Curated annotation (Swiss-Prot):
Protein name listed in UniProt: Valine--tRNA ligase
Motif 'KMSKS' region in this chain: 529-533
Subcellular compartments: Cytoplasm
GO cellular component: cytosol
Length: 880
């Protein structure tokens, strides 16, 4: 039958590009991406992790956007006011580096341009990037409320940043001081501890002799950086180290510099490292810095910010660090103070952005005092007010919070939130939410703002509430804070997640979200991390162009689970594309066979397969809801795919075809509509475009409440337990098992598609029920005639017949109906001969003592397993 005449003819193949453009524009025009203002239900809120403006869309973004869109679309279908607030991050150092490189190609520097003109160049580059990010998310089907889109340098976030900075400063939680920081010489800025990647590098450890001032001997120290000895202000030993008991309190003369420095005792010294005595350079080592504070040691900086040696380096002033090292080692050797050099592998910090070696350096910077802020953030997770998924990351979060250090928030950049601090020539420092016009102390108008900007993560930490209008008490803030779920990658739990919790509780006195869902990384199909150098990067936009958005979404989320990495390769992408095509073809078959009028679902008297598919549909619905509530979106997706392809398409539709050809049969159309409408709604969060397109064709056949609704806002299916039918599932299970066994038998014996096989089915008590489906068994298994008999068959397989023993059913198939027995006998005979040749060869090899002595055990075991397999196969073939 033809489909309803009021509808356009369905295309034979799914045209993704055309469908995606049409429906996304339609959803935007209808305002579906905005939270429903009329709903009295509790809002469901996700604030999008703002992607950096520097980046092209990659698979990580695709996974994030898809998982968040799944949640938003699901909760929208549950009737909740669903808000997904999008945005982008100004990306601080990463963005500035890109623009500076562009200027360098033109022979210009930011210093030559000046701050104002350079920032104009930044905005010229950033604005198109923001447009690109928005367009890329739209192509992914992201149902964000684009009218609420926020950029971290928009006026709202700028106001929020100044508010929190001023508040924390007034509480004594932000301070400016000389502290040891991580200095990136290439980016020319301080970076936080979290922005330093530690890599194990092969190096050396130098043992240096420092002479005691009283001439009584030497103290030998071990160091991996001999050039820093020029800034030493002490030698430290452990107070319990008996080797140095008499030396503590004495002085040594620092070689080359001839500076008198003390021998001190400190419990931080590792007695097992080197000689147990260490040089202390407070200005160039984090541990030494803390030791220097404890012992009031001078802090002598010997390097400039470009890592060349400064005037404090004595004879090495003006040298590079490498040249300085060579000079120091040579000089100590000539003085007889270099005891030995050993190979040594040690951890060296590198800038996460540019990979330059990080230089620990004492510098005047702005810091946040984290310990008082961390306590309530830790309690929020410990008390369960915030749940972290998977649970194992809770321990990671707790450990970091319990050992937190002060956060260096100033960056020597121009692009970002400029620190809201001004300096007056009179010495007054003004911290203000607004630009001051005059010094409150002397009245001077000659104020200079601090040149530094804030760490990008400082503004990102305010994201859940600054995007909703804070510090103003807006209606959005009242309605949508706190958020429901924070979904992001597990690798930024410290960078971003922890800081949002800290800032949210500080500003709002309430947690910023209830659940933290951490997804894993997407690796290639071999489990390798994707990188341009490896050539294994998959461009999601190219995948969309080739296979469509729904296929990409289905592929990136398939097999995912909270916190675990997943694999993605061509095989999975093609499988997702095939599922899209399967869904289209199956739906097209159903819709093209629905006729002109709606058919109502009978209240009773449904055939077995109808009761079975309705029972399975409701069980699958219950499973999907449970799994989605547990954030197991990958598993819910697998359950759905198995049902759609493995039960609805492969079995129910095939059985329905038999009835559609028989006018006397009970019509399967109402059940086809019921199940397909449920499938489309269950799949919509995962595959929004194809489901909306198919829904548009199905709507005329749906009940009025559904037929007048676009699927994006249609009610999400709920399981009806009264439809669970264990009897129907059991009987259909047997029917499916019989057909599948016959299909497998055909495949094993390479039976031509045009050839029918014969079968006797001994079904015991189920014979009468299965007899009602004789035609279906014959059609689906390409078997004819099929005899369904009572009782059971006790015989075994022979050369003339195959006996398949199923669950309480025996299927007997004469070999003559599948193969030419004479030709088959010759084939088996030839196969046995070949196998026996292999057995003879392997037996000889495994009897060879030289082979057994020289070959790896794994190779021997592999050969032995192969031999056993050949022997078992010969035995099986001879038995037949």
């Amino acid at each position: 039958m033809a489909q309803c005449s009021g509808l356009p003819e369905m295309a034979k193949a799914y045209e993704a590009a055309e469908v995606e453009k049409k429906w996304y524009q339609y959803w935007m025009e209808k305002g579906y991406f905005k939270p429903n203002p009329d709903s009295d239900k509790k809002p469901f809120v996700i604030i999008m992790p703002p992607p950096n403006v520097t980046g092209e869309l990659h698979l990580g973004h695709a996974l994030t956007a898809t998982l968040e869109d799944i949640m938003i679309r699901w909760h929208r279908m549950l009737g909740e006011p669903a808000l997904w607030l999008p945005g982008a991050d100004h990306a601080g150092i990463a963005a500035q580096v890109v623009v500076e490189r562009m200027l360098a190609k033109q022979g210009k520097t930011r210093q030559e341009l000046g701050r104002e003109l350079f920032l104009e160049k930044m905005w010229e580059w950033v604005n198109p990037c923001r447009e690109r990010i928005r367009h890329q998310h739209m192509r992914l089907g992201a149902s964000c409320d684009w009218d609420r889109e926020t950029f971290t340098l928009d006026p709202g976030p700028v106001k929020a940043v100044r508010e929190i900075f001023t508040n924390l400063y007034q509480k004594g939680l932000i301070y400016r001081g000389e502290r040891i920081i991580n200095w990136c010489p290439r980016c020319a800025t301080a970076v936080s501890d979290l922005e330093v990647d530690h890599k194990d590098l092969a190096g050396h450890i130098w043992h240096l002799r420092y002479p005691l001032e009283d001439g009584s001997g030497f103290v030998t120290v071990a160091t991996t950086r001999p050039e820093t000895m020029l800034g030493d202000t002490a030698v430290a030993v452990h107070p319990d180290d008996a080797r140095y008991t008499g030396m503590v309190g004495k002085n040594v003369l620092l070689p080359i510099m001839n500076r008198r420095i003390p021998v001190i005792a400190d419990e931080a010294v590792d007695m097992a490292f080197g000689t147990g005595a260490v040089k202390v350079t407070p200005a160039h080592d984090p541990n030494d810095f803390e030791m220097g504070l404890r012992h009031s040691l001078p802090m002598i900086t010997i390097q400039n910010r470009d890592t060349t040696m400064n005037e404090n380096a004595g004879p090495c002033s003006g040298m590079t660090a490498k040249a300085c090292r060579e000079y120091v080692v040579s000089e100590l050797k000539s003085l007889g103070l270099l005891l030995k050099i050993e190979d040594y592998t040690h951890s060296v910090g590198h800038c996460q952005r540019c990979s330059a070696v990080i230089e620990p350096m004492v510098s005047k910077q702005w810091f946040v005092k984290m310990e008082p802020l961390a306590k309530p953030a830790l309690e929020a997770v410990n008390s369960g007010r915030i749940q972290i998924l998977p649970e194992r990351f809770t321990k990671v979060y707790q450990n970091w919070m319990e050992n937190i250090r002060d956060w260096c928030i100033s960056r020597q950049l121009w692009w970002g939130h400029r620190i809201p601090v001004w300096y007056c020539p009179c010495g007054e420092m003004i911290v203000s939410k607004e630009d001051p016009t005059a010094c409150p102390k002397c009245g001077s108008t000659k104020l200079e703002q601090d040149p530094d900007v804030l760490d990008t993560w400082f503004s990102s930490g305010l994201w859940p509430h600054s995007t909703l209008g804070w510090p103003d008490q807006t209606e959005d803030l009242k309605r949508f804070y706190p958020g429901s779920v924070l979904e992001t990658a597990y690798d930024i739990i410290f960078f971003w997640v922890a800081r949002m919790i800290v800032m949210g509780i500080e500003d709002m006195k309430e947690v910023p979200f209830r659940t933290v869902y951490l997804h894993g990384l997407i690796r290639d199909d071999k489990g390798e991390k994707m990188s341009k150098t490896k050539g294994n990067v998959i461009d999601p936009l190219k995948v969309i162009d080739q296979y469509g958005t729904d296929a990409l979404r289905f592929a990136v989320t398939f097999g995912t689970s909270p916190g675990n990495d997943s694999k993605l390769g061509q095989t999975k992408l093609e499988a997702a594309r095939n599922f899209v095509n399967k869904l289209w073809n199956a739906s097209r078959f159903v819709i093209m066979n629905l006729g002109e009028e709606k058919e109502l679902l009978p209240e009773a008297g449904l055939p077995l397969e109808d009761r079975w598919i309705l029972s399975r549909m409701n069980r699958v619905t219950a499973d999907v809801i449970r799994l989605m509530e547990e954030f197991q979106f990958g598993e819910a997706q697998r359950v759905l795919q198995d049902f759609v392809w493995g039960e609805f398409c492969d079995w129910y539709i095939e059985l329905a075809k038999v009835r559609l050809r028989d006018e006397a049969s009970v019509s399967p159309r109402p059940v086809l509509v019921k199940v397909l409408s449920t499938i489309l709604r269950l799949l919509h969060p995962y595959m929004p475009f194809i489901t909306e397109e198919l829904w548009s064709y199905l709507r005329p056949y749906l009940p009025k409440s559904l037929g007048e609704t676009d699927i994006i806002v249609a009610p999400f299916p709920q399981a009806d337990e009264t439809c669970f039918d264990e009897q129907a599932e059991s009987i259909m299970g047997s029917l499916v098992e019989v057909v599948r066994s016959l299909r497998n038998l055909r495949a094993e014996h390479n039976v031509e598609i045009s050839r029918y096989i014969q079968a006797n089915i001994y079904a015991g008590d189920m014979a009468e029920v299965l007899s009602n489906y004789l035609g279906a068994v014959e059609t689906l298994s390409r078997s004819r005639p099929v005899n369904i008999l009572p009782g059971h068959y006790s015989g075994a397989s022979t050369a003339t017949e195959v006996v398949l023993v199923l669950n309480g059913i025996e299927v007997v198939v004469p070999m003559s109906t599948m193969v030419d027995l004479e030709a088959e006998a010759k084939r088996v005979e030839a196969e046995i001969a070949e196998l026996e040749t292999q057995i003879e060869r392997l037996s000889a090899r495994l009897s060879d003592t030289q082979f057994l002595a020289k070959a790896p055990q794994a190779v021997v075991d592999k050969e032995r397993t192969k031999l056993e397999g050949y022997i078992e196969k010969v035995s099986r073939l001879k038995a037949v």
